[in-house]
């Protein structure tokens, strides 16, 4: 009887222990569930503005569907306002207007809260393992110092397979095209821009929204994937040859062989790096491209600040025309998926900026790289996309644009509208809204994407590198001049056919050697514009030789001079002159001065 009771008591104690454990878990689990808090990035003390609340996102699969909505508009100054960096957070009560490609504002409020649907698929990208901005800046600084991209070991690179835009899905491509077409500004009087850097107040400045690079930031429902759509702030592609815009300056700086020099007089020159015809200082060009007020530097800063808001999100990039080229350069720098539309060929600036390049590739030919994750959509009737908008009669030239680059990195997805639709090459087909309505929506299928093969930029040019930041060229020239002098007697006693045959004194010419060393700080089209010359002249006198001609001939002196015989002058008088010439007098003989021989008489 006692044994069953003892066993029952033991099991009762065990049940009590299990119950106690379950009660403890029940008390802990609610606290774990309620521990979810919105994550704040960057402290209030570190920045002058209140950061937005960005909740943590769950990991998602590489393939799926995303619904993106506009979350922020970021303005990064470049030319006139290099310190400007402002952000507009989109709220339910935000009022926006649409800006057309011609720069005309729509008076009606824009509808921007409609979600953009896109799908993702796995994409493999070869990129740096350490992609922190500070590390990237070190690589770029080393490239500027060395004159080319630094060589990194294979251990510093990795091939990652991540979620990227589905470039085989027409709806996804349309979504990205519409994102690049959107350009919004706040309704006047409702502005709510925040200064990110907290240094300057541009609320009373005029025109700051027309300076620099603008990014529209879209995020999906979980904030796990964001899309940065980059665009230049000059809405109209061509605003006349007499108007200077930031886009024109950056276009000619990044996509010209030498900053708009060496071509049409209509091109706007944005640096002075040309030495002579088809010869330029590459160091000078690279320094101009890396100025802090240029679009590439602005894109790095813009990307860095956006990723601080979404540190764990997957970032996709897109853009149209110049914005597409900047998105591609940014994607090559950080190893991000990129989808562009009618982008300017960007392999030339990618090589000059010294972007990190994986082992086995030539840094001077980034168009040969594989696994970049970049896809460039465009059609054959667009001269900007095809790299042919640089002829004498092209609209680009007449607009002041020197767009000489022809090669894209990554893969090109080309609609052959010239062959399929009979289109003529024209700049009007470059507009993104025309591309959406007349190309992407009209074609049933997307084009096949393939890398560009055997493409080279600026083949006629020769580039050299200079030491240091100052543009200096030094040349040394040696000039030899000969001066011939001759001394003649004052009276010519023996005239000849081609001059006097009298005694003459001839002096061998002295030889003068002049060495000129010039330093040129500003090379011009056909030479140096500000030479400072130092001339050293050395003159060597030759010995003087005197010769006497005694027996002159037709072409010079033949032998020593023989004694001369002087004759007395003959005298004649004419008493009966002729009518026209001659004398009718009887000739008067003149005795010879030489004594005649004696007459011999025979005895």
Curated annotation (Swiss-Prot):
It is a single-pass type II membrane protein. Residues 1-20 are cytoplasmic. Keywords: Autophagy, Endosome, Glycoprotein, Hydrolase, Lipid degradation, Lipid metabolism, Membrane, Signal-anchor, Transmembrane, Transmembrane helix. Its main location: membrane. Residues 42-603 are lumenal. One of its GO terms (cellular component) is vacuolar membrane. Glycans are attached at residues 166, 201, 223, 281, 305, 467. The chain crosses the membrane at residues 21-41. It is found in: Endosome, Multivesicular body membrane; Prevacuolar compartment membrane. GO terms for biological process: multivesicular body membrane disassembly; neutral lipid catabolic process; pexophagy; phosphatidylserine catabolic process; piecemeal microautophagy of the nucleus; vacuolar protein processing. Belongs to the AB hydrolase superfamily. Lipase family. Binds to both phosphatidylinositol (PI) and phosphatidylinositol 3,5-bisphosphate (PIP2). Lipase which is essential for lysis of subvacuolar cytoplasm to vacuole targeted bodies and intravacuolar autophagic bodies. Involved in the lysis of intravacuolar multivesicular body (MVB) vesicles. The intravacuolar membrane disintegration by atg15 is critical to life span extension. This is Putative lipase atg15. It comes from Emericella nidulans (strain FGSC A4 / ATCC 38163 / CBS 112.46 / NRRL 194 / M139) (Aspergillus nidulans).
């Amino acid at each position: 009887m006692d044994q069953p009771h003892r066993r029952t008591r033991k099991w009762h104690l065990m049940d009590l222990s299990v119950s106690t454990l379950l009660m403890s878990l029940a008390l802990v689990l609610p606290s774990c569930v309620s521990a979810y808090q919105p994550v704040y990035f960057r402290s209030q003390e570190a920045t002058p503005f209140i950061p937005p609340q960005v909740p943590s996102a769950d990991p998602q699969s590489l393939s799926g569907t995303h619904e993106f909505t506009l979350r922020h508009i970021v303005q990064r100054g470049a030319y006139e306002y290099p310190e400007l960096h402002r952000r507009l957070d989109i709220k339910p009560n935000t009022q926006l207007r649409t800006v057309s490609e011609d720069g005309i504002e729509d008076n009606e409020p824009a509808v921007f809260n409609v979600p953009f649907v896109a799908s993702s698929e796995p994409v493999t990208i070869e990129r740096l393992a350490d992609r922190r901005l500070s590390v990237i800046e070190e690589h770029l600084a080393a490239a500027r110092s060395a004159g080319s991209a630094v060589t990194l070991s294979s251990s510093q690179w990795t091939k990652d397979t991540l979620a990227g835009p589905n470039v085989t899905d027409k709806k996804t491509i349309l979504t990205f095209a519409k994102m690049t077409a959107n350009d919004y500004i706040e309704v006047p009087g409702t502005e709510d821009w925040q200064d990110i850097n907290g240094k300057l107040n541009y609320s009373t400045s005029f025109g700051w929204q027309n300076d620099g690079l603008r990014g529209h930031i879209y995020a999906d429902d979980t904030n796990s994937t964001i899309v940065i759509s980059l665009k230049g702030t000059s809405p109209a592609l061509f605003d006349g040859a007499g108007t200077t815009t930031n886009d024109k300056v950056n276009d000619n700086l990044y996509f010209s062989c030498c900053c708009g020099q060496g071509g049409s007089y209509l091109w706007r020159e944005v640096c002075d790096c040309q030495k002579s015809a088809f010869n330029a200082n590459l160091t000078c060009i690279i320094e101009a491209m890396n100025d802090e007020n240029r679009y590439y530097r602005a894109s790095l800063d813009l990307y860095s600040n956006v990723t601080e808001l979404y540190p764990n999100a997957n970032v996709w990039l897109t853009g149209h025309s110049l914005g597409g080229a900047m998105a591609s350069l940014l994607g090559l720098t950080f190893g991000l998926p990129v989808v562009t539309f009618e982008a300017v060929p960007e392999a030339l600036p990618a090589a000059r900026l010294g972007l990190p390049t994986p082992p086995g590739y030539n840094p001077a030919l980034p168009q040969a790289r594989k696994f970049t994750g970049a896809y460039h959509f465009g059609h054959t009737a667009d001269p900007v996309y095809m790299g042919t908008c640089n002829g004498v009669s092209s609209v680009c030239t007449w607009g002041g644009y020197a767009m000489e680059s022809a090669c894209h990195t990554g893969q090109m997805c080309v609609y052959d509208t010239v062959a399929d639709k009979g289109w003529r090459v024209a700049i009007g087909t470059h507009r993104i809204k025309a591309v959406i309505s007349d190309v992407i929506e009209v074609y049933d299928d997307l084009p096949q994407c393939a890398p560009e093969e055997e493409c080279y930029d600026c083949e006629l040019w020769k580039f050299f590198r200079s030491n240091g930041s100052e543009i200096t060229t030094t040349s040394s020239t040696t000039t030899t001049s000969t001066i011939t002098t001759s001394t003649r007697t004052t009276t010519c006693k023996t005239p000849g056919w081609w001059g006097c045959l009298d005694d003459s004194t001839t002096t061998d010419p002295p030889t003068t050697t002049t060495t000129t060393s010039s330093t040129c700080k500003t090379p011009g089209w056909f030479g140096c514009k500000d030479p400072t010359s130092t001339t050293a002249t050395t003159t060597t006198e030759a010995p003087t030789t005197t010769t006497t001609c005694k027996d002159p001939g037709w072409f010079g002196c033949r032998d020593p001079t023989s004694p001369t015989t002087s004759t007395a002058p003959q005298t004649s008088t004419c008493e009966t002159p002729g009518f026209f010439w001659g004398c009718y007098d009887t000739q008067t003989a003149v005795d010879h001065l030489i004594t005649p021989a004696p007459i011999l008489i025979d005895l």
